[in-house]
Amino acid sequence: MELSMKKFTVRRFFSVYLRKKSRSKSSSLSRLEEEGIVKEIDISNHVKEGFEKADPSQFELLKVLGQGSYGKVFLVRKVTGSDAGQLYAMKVLKKATLKVRDRVRSKMERDILAEVNHPFIVKLHYAFQTEGKLYLILDFLRGGDLFTRLSKEVMFTEEDVKFYLAELALALDHLHGLGIIYRDLKPENILLDEEGHIKITDFGLSKEATDHDKRAYSFCGTIEYMAPEVVNRRGHTQSADWWSFGVLMFEMLTGSLPFQGKDRKETMALILKAKLGMPQFLSAEAQSLLRALFKRNPCNRLGAGVDGVEEIKRHPFFVTIDWNKLYRKEIKPPFKPAVGRPEDTFHFDPEFTARTPTDSPGVPPSANAHHLFRGFSFVASSLVQEPSQQDVPKAPIHPIVQQLHGNNIHFTDGYEIKEDIGVGSYSVCKRCVHKATDAEYAVKIIDKSKRDPSEEIEILLRYGQHPNIITLKDVYDDGKYVYLVMELMRGGELLDRILRQRCFSEREASDVLYTIARTMDYLHSQGVVHRDLKPSNILYMDESGNPESIRICDFGFAKQLRAENGLLMTPCYTANFVAPEVLKRQGYDAACDVWSLGILLYTMLAGFTPFANGPDDTPEEILARIGSGKYALSGGNWDSISDAAKDVVSKMLHVDPQQRLTAVQVLKHPWIVNREYLSQNQLSRQDVHLVKGAMAATYFALNRTPQAPRLEPVLSSSLAQRRGMKRLTSTRL
């Protein structure tokens, strides 16, 4: 009698198979014996020298990342030992609920992870057991899984897909070198770190070859990704992984699966026929690689030969890949996930992350259960420390907030609101105090009826790790307002501080411009334009006045470059497929950012603004002066300022955006490159209030002009809709 199985998936971390009750226990047992599975599970002790043995008391539970009948996956923080403060994913398996096959898979996953050490494979740091449970302590990867990216966020090109496939090929080759067949390759099992590099996870279905031909015979994996030899159960080798590799490549390039019928039976029939209609929009190299991977006979499949992965690496599709640089992570990923604090779980299912993290002791399965998992303990040889950050409270409604807090905690439960810091058209900024720690922050309170804060939040999450961009600490939503908790800028506004400074020189002005231009170049290179870079949005983190403490703030008008369907675009996609008028608009917005920096630089050097004489100038007068492109570069401070400074100012304030310097050109200008030789003589300035009033009048005049139409992200894509019934919907920002 055939053994019936039902698949249960806990997203991103763990897949197990729950066995339906079979009418014939003997047939089930014989099937297990055929697959080389025994009841006794013996796992050797593995404690590396210099590290203490771990136990559950050493880990603080922060959030639930996933849950099933077998147990849970938690986000945890180590509270003792040399790696105290480090965040991990803790997989907790209840011995009593694990069937024999699942116990074997748990043992197998632990064994494989303990043996594997590779940049593109999730790392096991500890393994241990109590009377009722097994524990695996793994890397916590904040970038979510590749499926989310494929379906909801980014437009990929062949060049981008090539990057992910190349990293994946190196990971598979490493496993194959250890005699391991992965057998469950699919986007859900490919996680992204915060930089966008991949790590494959979920080794519950992986298997070391069992017979002298290095073949395995069990029927496992996700049906659409199975190789023909897995479907027909005639035994499979590592070559089966290269078929799945081809399925993943096809899906990433086309948005659909190559072999998918209306039901399981039809899908299996299509796989066994291995006949594929090749999309003609794919490059000749991509088509060639797919044909070489989709060979029905595994012996003829690319990667199955004596050279193994070298056959794949030599294929023309990968001709542009530098494999050594790739392994060292020196090639920049095409996409950077939006991640904030280390403990953020934006890319995990809110059904799980909203739950209170509790780990019950677990009921021992039987008197001799402990012996079934002999020697489960393991400690990694090296533990990389990350800076510990405070755990911040929790809240509701906006998708991002769902991920952080659940449904029942409000901003005022965790923070006490203090005085106003600043007031804008759509928001107010206040000082606030975290009740549990007395730490001070700034909270930006946005009226949702006037502005959708999603774009601002996503930009801050994705790029707020830059040292000169304000850091988003937490997000709350009460339905009417969104609360963005950010670091408090104690040093005040840049221009205010400079104008009140007793001594300010041309050399200091160049240091300030260098820091801000470098930050804008970073944003522009990522397809982000600020569009509101007035001096009041450039602040100091502290009272030092050091350029390193400068932060770019208020991304309320900022935009990420998106396709017409609202998806983000990789740099490669932008260069090859974006309409000229879209790029022109993006270039115009970037040029406006540089123009704003030109206004700031002019004011720092001259001591007054270029286009407004004071707060009483009318918008019409100011706009007329801006349109003429005329401003003074002689008299006053200008008589002692270098020609290089005048040159960079005039090129940043050029009336034609296309002739204006870009941020990267500003950084390469001699005035910046040779700034250590600039004068340190004190520059004079007008009255502080007069200058600030003139600056405010300038931006008031500019903001009266119509804003460009805003592109909003779509909530889903065809790929997400196609696979929507197969898994829970992923959250997008």
Curated annotation (Swiss-Prot):
It comes from the Eukaryota. Residues 319-388 form the AGC-kinase C-terminal domain. Its EC number is 2.7.11.1. ATP binds at residues 65-73, 91, 421-429, 444. The gene is Rps6ka2. Residues 59-318, 415-672 form the Protein kinase domain. This is Ribosomal protein S6 kinase alpha-2. Its cofactor is Mg(2+). Serine/threonine-protein kinase that acts downstream of ERK (MAPK1/ERK2 and MAPK3/ERK1) signaling and mediates mitogenic and stress-induced activation of transcription factors, regulates translation, and mediates cellular proliferation, survival, and differentiation. May function as tumor suppressor in epithelial ovarian cancer cells. It comes from Mus musculus. The lineage of its organism: Eukaryota, Metazoa, Chordata, Craniata, Vertebrata. It catalyses: L-seryl-[protein] + ATP = O-phospho-L-seryl-[protein] + ADP + H(+); L-threonyl-[protein] + ATP = O-phospho-L-threonyl-[protein] + ADP + H(+). It is found in: Nucleus; Cytoplasm.
